[in-house]
Amino acid sequence: VHKMLKEVYHPHIEFLVSRKMKLQKNNVYILKVSKAREILDSRGNPTVEAEVTVRGENPKTDLITGRAAVPSGASTGKFEAAEIRDGEDRYLGAGVKKAVTNVNTIINEMLIGQNALNQRRIDRMMLSEDGTDNKSKLGANAILAVSIANLNACAKALNIFTYKFTGGISACKMPMPMMNILNGGAH
């Protein structure tokens, strides 16, 4: 069947069929650990970096780690998702140790043992735990960092590009880069 599909359909069907077979064979990529730390972004502002490690087929040797940092924009609007900032003297109140603590405790405990390949479920679990419209309980910076780190870990575990993991069957072409020519806000 695999050979027939490869000959009949689009060349990327090989990737899709092999990926589906791998996923059906066993749910191997289970979330093992998520941890976070405070780092400085390109403007010198504190931001959250999360690390998610998943187990592969051989739990003793297959540990795959994804990492993501989520710096904020220079200006934020009142309708944007809420970042958690410390509000203390460190970094003029812009520290993110509270968000880091949320990842290392609440989010970590909630996600350990979950199927990391089910990105939608991972995201929904974090959003449900937060329970606010603007993500002000856990912090959008904490939630997004873990979500992207998980996405990166899963793509590495399957040995595919991130855009193919997120795009599924419609990920036949690499996304076209886009950039701002004119932009507002503070810089």
Predicted regions and their residues:
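Flexible glycine-/small-residue-enriched beta->alpha junction loops
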Residues: 64-71, 75-80, 163-187
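A short beta-strand signature
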Residues: 48-57
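Methionine residue identity
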Residues: 1-4, 21
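Conserved phosphate/anionic-ligand binding catalytic regions in large, soluble enzymes, centered on
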Residues: 40-41, 45-48, 134-155, 176-187
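Short, hydrophobic/aliphatic alpha-helical segments
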Residues: 30, 54, 120-135, 168-178
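Intrinsic-disorder-associated, low-complexity terminal segments enriched in Asp/Asn/His/Tyr and depleted
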Residues: 2, 9-12
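Short, Gly/Pro- and small/polar-rich lid/capping loops
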Residues: 12-47
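Metal- or metallocofactor-binding catalytic centers and their adjacent structured scaffolds
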Residues: 71-156, 160
